Amino acid sequence: MARGPHDASPPGSTERHARRRGRRARRVAAAAVVTLAALVAGAGAGNGAVRPAATPTCHSAWTLAGRGAALHDALAARRDVLGERLLAMRRGPTYAAARRLLPPLWYAVGHGGRPLTLSGAYYLPFAYPFTVYGPQAFALHVADGSEIRTRRADGPGLTVFVGDGRERYGSCLARLRPPRLARGWLPVLRTGYADARGARYAQESFAGRIPGIRSLVSFVRLRVDAAHARGAAVVRFVASPGFGARLLADAAGERDGRGVVYRIRGTAVIHVAWVHARANADIVPDGAVYDAARGAVSRLWDNALARGTTFEVPEQRVVDAERSLLVQQRSLAWRYSVGNPYEELSFAEALDAARVTAAYGHADVSEAILRLAVRRLPARYTNWRAGAVLVAAADLFRLTRDRALVDRVTPALTTVLRRLEHQLRGAGPGLLDREPFSSDVTRPVIGLHGQATVWQGLLAMARVWSRLDDPRLAARATWAAERLERALRQAARASTRRLADGSLFVPAALGDRARPYAALTASRDGSYWNLVMPYVLASGLFDPDGPTARGIWRYMGAHGSRLLGLVRARAGRLYGRGPSAASGVDQVYGVNVARFLADADLPDQLVLSLYGMLAGAMTRDTFVSGEAATVAPLRAARLGSMYLPPNSGTSTAFLETLRLALVHERRGPRGAPSGLDLAFSTPRAWLREGATIRVTGASTSFGPVSYVLSRRGDIVRVGLDAPPVPTLRLRLRLPAGMHVRRVTMSGRAVAFDAASGTIRFPPGARGTLELVVGIGP
């Protein structure tokens, strides 16, 4: 995929593991072929052998029937025909409509198309973090309930067998109840399964701690009902060779080599634990131990999320996704992924995560990411990375007002500024030097995306240094930004081509005479253009309401940039070198699309992206994503595949999209904050009868903002706690057919735009404000 600039793998992912990973990957691939073949043939797999299934097929119940042609047509089209279908609905885009169009994501694919797990299913990364600094332990719980792995997908682990003791739990998708999270978002995995003999199982698992054991511990509770099965249920928990001592079981289990066996007639509840590091443990993980550990996990995450901003909307799936993704972001921190070769610092993506977690009130995570990026930048320097660091540092100060953080990173940022000044003072036109297009494309270019990011970062840090009474650094950064801006605008104008449809094509590599792409995903270069151009649009270099930005956006919309509101990509690492129509999505790069959509006030497109992500960019009910995802399933599979999940980038994109729908800062021509727009891009159903939207403590450049919108009948009541802000606006996006009719504040009329539902607060409005809004047909 595009991969923004990224750093080398962290400790624990070093070259000494490479040969072992290669051998393990070959074994995993071979085993997965057996498993997938069993699924296609209508059988479950257990202990390497194909077991007869009680049902004629073990495929997922989801089918392409009636959808295959529509998906093919959508992939071949240059417009977002699926998105346009949802936008044309009277209610606008909804999750229910979006989920019917795309297959659920299920399979985790690595390099060379190899599955990451034995069953091919994705895994969830569970952690019990004590600090966002330094290495962390991770437990990888496979989504079908079949396995738990230690730290890496090829690490030691625990496998669950049921039925006659040889049927892998979850191996028949037709008999697997889809995975969910406890309370909708907690890192506690729940699945259900029926084996080939008719016994039924309900499994819950999570990662936590046991007093006296320093290691992270995974806990499993398995409820078994074999009362109506054809014979006893034989449940086996089997550890990897040489790791049997890490498996702890309750008193009912019988040791059997490196595993534990239960033979059940009737019903039973089983408790086992998997210790992820060597430890002297003689604890029996009974129900009391399990409940205590689970309670601690619940309290940990309740407390962690309570410290940040809360966005409460009248759509539980969106709230669950928000909370689950915040858990993931706090756990992964700077990591692009966990448990696979993508566990690394990827600069642009990690720094986007830092900006978004700061906006959600989790500044400890944001600071950890920024400080690591600053520390690693000298050895991995590119101008794009430097620009991303400048933008993130300025954003963190803007949202937290943490002067101490700026003081800590200013020496490193001064070195960056000196390096940029040296390039800009050269004999050239005022552009920065050529550098690799991205970490995946090493061709040296004058990258508009990287240089626009530097321009944005220089101006942002100039404002920070000015506010902190450092006029010398502020003046130097301003000079560098202005010189770069003049050269960038001139180079962009010289490279721009106007197409017959009135749209504009601006190449990402300036001066290289790139021609417009008829279909962006038909070529590697076009696909990469589509992934990096959002950095330009989000930087503010081009006025989001101006002809250049709108012309580029029109070009993107007519040449295959989006599908169901998601960023399209060639996805060659998933599909291989197939036909151009076999493209996927790469929503990691949707974060900057969302920023542009908010700046350009395109609310319906932002809503489309929100639901597109829930339906097609992450797993349903568990909210795991990869760097890229298929649209049409691979080969004989009915379900979608992801590349090297989990991935923090798509999580960042969803959280930013949700935040921008509810709280958006307007910016001036040079990026300085100029006003607040509240609830400007919400789904219209969020103001249906009886609905309430609540935002608490959202960080902004002007200070925290909180508000409540509550509709009862033909009245919407607004309660707002606003900081001092130059201009303050609120929008009520009502269901189709309803309009704002009158607005009063303390008995006085307030100006509003009936067409858009936008309310303009009087100049100087601040503090506690209350509105009464009358609505009607």
Predicted feature residues:
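Carbohydrate-active enzyme catalytic cores, enriched for enzymes
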Residues: 166-167, 462-468, 476-561, 636-770, ...
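Active-site acid/base region of carbohydrate-active enzymes
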Residues: 303-326, 347-348, 384, 388-391, ...
